[in-house]
Amino acid sequence: MKAVHFGAGNIGRGFVGLLLHNAGYEVVFADVAEGLIAQLADADSYAVHEVGESPAVQTVDNFRALNSNTQEAELITEIATADIVTTAVGPHILKFVAPVIARGIAARGAGMAPLQVMACENAINATDVLAREVASRPEAAGGALDGQAVFANTAVDRIVPNQEAGQGLDVTVESFYEWVIDRTAFAGSEPEIPGATFVDELAPYIERKLFTVNTGHASAAYFGFEAGLEKISDAMADQDVAEDVRAVLEETKQLLVAKHGFSNEAQEAYVQKILVRFTNPHLPDTVNRVGRAPLRKLSRHERFIGPAAELAERGVVPEALLGAISAALRFTDPADAEATELAGILASGSAADATARITGLDPDHPLFNAVSTLVEERQAELAATSA
C-alpha cells in the first residue's frame, strides 16, 4: 500500500504521516521546501516524540520524498499508483496542490480502485474545497475523472508546537490525537487506517473540534498575550486566563449541545479533556505561534465569529466569545503578516467598515454591532498610542 502526503512539515511528519506509516503504508512526502525534502530523501527514518500523560517515541521509516516544484513528473507517477492522497498544507494552499493531484488521477490505469483523497486541514470541509479545485482542472473536463477518485472530509486534532532547534526531522507532539473521517464517501471501501475513526456524519465532529479545540487554543493565546505570557501552558496556569478560556468553551458547549445533540455531560467531558491538553507543560507552545494569522481566525465561519454568530442568531449574547474577539483584535506580532494586516485595517476606515472586512458579518447581523463596538474601542486605543 502507498500513500502520497502533501506537506512534510511537523504535522505531516508527526501526525498524518505517522498514522499512515503505522497503518502499513509506504509514505511519499511531497513539499516545496527544498531543504526539508533533501533531508527526508537522505534519511532512513525519523522519530516522533509523544509527550504528555503517556509519553512514547515512535520511529517512522519506509518513506520517500519528492519536491513538488521540481519533480512534478515523478509526483504524478506516484499519485497514479497510490492508494491514498492526503494533505496537511493549510487550507489556502489546496488550490496549489490540486493541479498535480488532477494530473495524477488522470494518469491512473484502467481498472484501478479509485484514489482515496483526504485533506487533513484545520478547516471545515477542506476536502470539498480540494475536490472543487481538482474538478476545475482541464484534466477533469467532461467528467473525465469521474469514478477515478473519492474525496472524504476529515476532522483532525493533534497539537504540534514549534520544534526546538537542532531536532532535525524528529518531531515532538502531544500524545493525544484524533482523525475522524467521513465514511459515506467510500461506499463501504474505507481505507485501512487503524488510528482513524470513521463516522457516518462528520459535521458535528468537525464543529465540535473547531469550536472547542481551536476556539479554546486561540483564546488561550490571545488572553495569554494580553497578560504578557509567553507559553500556552503558562497562560493556562494563570487563573484569570484559565477562567476566561473556560467561559468561552462554556458558550461553545451550549451551542454544540443545542445544535448537534451532544449530551451536556459528553461535551463537558470533552471540554475538560481539551483543557488538560492545553496545560501540558511538555509542549513548548507559544502564544505567538497559536495566535498567528488572526485575520483567518476572526473570519466569518472560523473559531470565534462562527460560534458567536450562531449564538447571537439564537438570541444569546456571547459575552465570553466577544471577550476573546476583543483580545484577538489586540494581538500584535511584527513577524506575522496577518497581524500586521489586521493593524492596518484597524488604522484605516470606520469601525463598521473594519468590522465587515475583518469578520465578513453583514451589518444587519445580530452580532455585528457588538463586534463593531470592540473594533471601535481598539481603534481608539491605537489612535491614542500614535498621537
UniProtKB/Swiss-Prot annotation:
NAD(+) binds at residues 3-14. Keywords: NAD, Oxidoreductase. Pfam families: Mannitol_dh (PF01232), Mannitol_dh_C (PF08125). GO terms for cellular component: cytosol. The keyword Transmembrane helix does not apply. The keyword NAD applies. Its EC number is 1.1.1.17. It catalyses: D-mannitol 1-phosphate + NAD(+) = beta-D-fructose 6-phosphate + NADH + H(+). GO terms for molecular function: mannitol-1-phosphate 5-dehydrogenase activity. GO terms for biological process: mannitol catabolic process. Belongs to the mannitol dehydrogenase family. NCBIfam families: PRK02318.1-2 (NF002646), PRK02318.2-5 (NF002652). This is Mannitol-1-phosphate 5-dehydrogenase. The gene is mtlD.
